[in-house]
Amino acid sequence: MIIYPAIDLKDGACVRLLRGEMSQATVFNTEPADQARLFESQGFEWLHLVDLNGAFEGKPVNGKAVESILGAVTVPVQLGGGIRDLKTIALWLEKGVSRVILGTVALREPELVREARREFPGKVAVGIDAREGYVAVAGWAETSTIKALDLALKFEDSGVAAIIYTDINRDGAMGGVNVEATSDLAFHLTTPVIASGAVSSIDDLIALKKEEDTGIQGVICGRALYDGRIDPKTALDLLSSVSVSGTPVTGKAG
């Protein structure tokens, strides 16, 4: 299982939001490239970037910060936020992003996701952010009437690299990741799932690791890494292990 340290960008700085509220932002580093270098030096093999301003405005906003990160590290980077057309996808991939995350357009223009996947195989993930089980878009400002699983199932045969699932009500609140909802989603899909939202302790990582065989391929971790609740080496050792304390992980039926 891969752990993805999160670098959320707002006004050029590395921040964490509380439940997706832009007014509830805590600045952790004013130099995102330095934060990226730190994560790489700690042994992380991927980085997860989000252009928060871009998610709200529907276009890239923190481009300079993203480019500074791409120039500072050698590990692959996945990026979401404000990516809503093929031109923007191509631009970021040309600049060195390894995988783009499509969120709002996955709900509003699912065919664009399929077209992007065909044009950029292995480079496109779908971000599904849910509030009480229903998909939220436009930087979480709007909640739809579509359930997360129903949207995910639309892309089962499209060949997207992963589904990134976030429980908005828990995100940034340190209340513990929603393991049940994440594993249930993964169980019903063949597409790998990456868990996100409120990972607050090693216990959360253990709980997710035990459900790895349902299809949970990775986990995004933010605030808990920044404030020291999760030790990088401990987390990396845990998630690279075959099982947790000898406890077999559960498997998919059939």
Curated annotation (Swiss-Prot):
EC number per UniProt: 5.3.1.16
Enzyme class: isomerase
Main location: cytoplasm
Keyword set, alphabetical order: Amino-acid biosynthesis, Cytoplasm, Histidine biosynthesis, Isomerase
Protein name according to UniProt: 1-(5-phosphoribosyl)-5-[(5-phosphoribosylamino)methylideneamino] imidazole-4-carboxamide isomerase
Gene3D superfamilies in UniProt: Aldolase class I
Record-linked NCBIfam families: 1-(5-phosphoribosyl)-5-[(5-phosphoribosylamino)methylideneamino]imidazole-4-carboxamide isomerase (TIGR00007)
Pfam families according to UniProt: His_biosynth (PF00977)
Highest classification ranks of the organism: Bacteria, Pseudomonadati, Pseudomonadota, Alphaproteobacteria, Rhodospirillales
Family according to the record: Belongs to the HisA/HisF family.
Organism expressing this protein natively: Azospirillum brasilense
